[in-house]
């Protein structure tokens, strides 16, 4: 496993549409391992491969670790897709490792049904709600070149982007804060 650098806005790679994973190879498993290590180190609860400059449809997630009880439940989703969504919506405050130190309320479908392949090559369909639904939608958005700030007002999005563009021009490097 290796720690990888997380790219941040305004990096144009974050706007790429990621390519499907053709086969679950040792290289894909190694990439997932690197993503878990990077996600835990950041710390975060989800990471899309494009966030470490790998434009493939792979997501890692661990929602259990967020609870701070020392337990983990790492999950990898290869070629995930939303195949159904509720009309009911829910608002969660979202953040992103690629947009450090910024959070905003985002409205998304409250429940979604997803299809994905696991690291053993098995295809699954699963219903997601609550934080899981929000997180999987957020990460799938990354695979499609969409950021959570695309779901907020144009004015707020412009202010956020201006902040990061100015910082990038000055050479300032945002580093996610470590938690104790």
Curated annotation (Swiss-Prot):
Catalytic activity: N-terminal N-formyl-L-methionyl-[peptide] + H2O = N-terminal L-methionyl-[peptide] + formate
Cofactor requirement: Fe(2+)
Residues the record marks as active site: 139
Classification via SUPFAM superfamilies: Peptide deformylase
Example of a GO MF term: peptide deformylase activity
GO biological process: co-translational protein modification; translation
UniProt-listed Enzyme Commission number(s): 3.5.1.88
Pfam family, one: Pep_deformylase
Binding of Fe cation, residues: 96, 138, 142
Hydrolase as UniProt keyword: yes
Cofactor note: Binds 1 Fe(2+) ion.
Keyword annotations: Hydrolase, Iron, Metal-binding, Protein biosynthesis
Catalytic EC class: hydrolase
Listed CDD domains: Pep_deformylase
Family affiliation: Belongs to the polypeptide deformylase family.
Purpose of the protein: Removes the formyl group from the N-terminal Met of newly synthesized proteins. Requires at least a dipeptide for an efficient rate of reaction. N-terminal L-methionine is a prerequisite for activity but the enzyme has broad specificity at other positions.
Xref: NCBIfam families: pept_deformyl, PRK00150.1-3
This protein's name: Peptide deformylase
Species of origin: Rhodopseudomonas palustris (strain BisA53)
């Amino acid at each position: 496993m290796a720690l990888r650098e997380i790219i941040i806005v305004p990096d144009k790679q974050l706007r790429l549409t990621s390519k499907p994973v053709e086969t679950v190879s040792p290289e894909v498993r190694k990439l997932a391992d690197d993503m878990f290590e990077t996600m835990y180190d950041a710390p975060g609860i989800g990471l899309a491969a494009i966030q470490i400059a790998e434009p493939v449809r792979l997501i890692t997630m661990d929602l259990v670790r967020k609870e701070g009880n020392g337990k983990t439940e790492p999950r990898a989703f290869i070629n995930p897709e939303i195949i159904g969504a509720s009309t009911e919506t829910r608002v969660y405050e979202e953040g992103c490792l690629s947009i450090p130190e910024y959070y905003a309320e985002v409205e998304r479908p409250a429940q979604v049904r997803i299809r994905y392949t696991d690291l053993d090559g098995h295809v699954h369909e699963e219903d997601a709600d609550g934080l899981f639904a929000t997180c999987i939608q957020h990460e799938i958005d990354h695979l499609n070149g969409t950021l959570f700030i695309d779901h907020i007002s144009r004015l707020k999005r412009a202010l956020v982007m201006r902040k990061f563009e100015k910082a990038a021009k000055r050479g300032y490097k945002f580093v996610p804060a470590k938690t104790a």
